[in-house]
Amino acid sequence: MDLSRIPPQPKAGILNVLIEIPAGS
């Protein structure tokens, strides 16, 4: 998981990303 790949966003948005994108990606 690379936080640098996703733009800054609310924590709720980050949670959604974590759910949509497997940690292994």
Curated annotation (Swiss-Prot):
Its cofactor is Mg(2+). GO terms for cellular component: cytoplasm. It catalyses: diphosphate + H2O = 2 phosphate + H(+). GO terms for molecular function: inorganic diphosphate phosphatase activity; metal ion binding. Hydrolyzes PPi generated in anabolic reactions. Belongs to the PPase family. This is Inorganic pyrophosphatase. The lineage of its organism: Bacteria, Bacillati, Cyanobacteriota, Cyanophyceae, Pseudanabaenales.
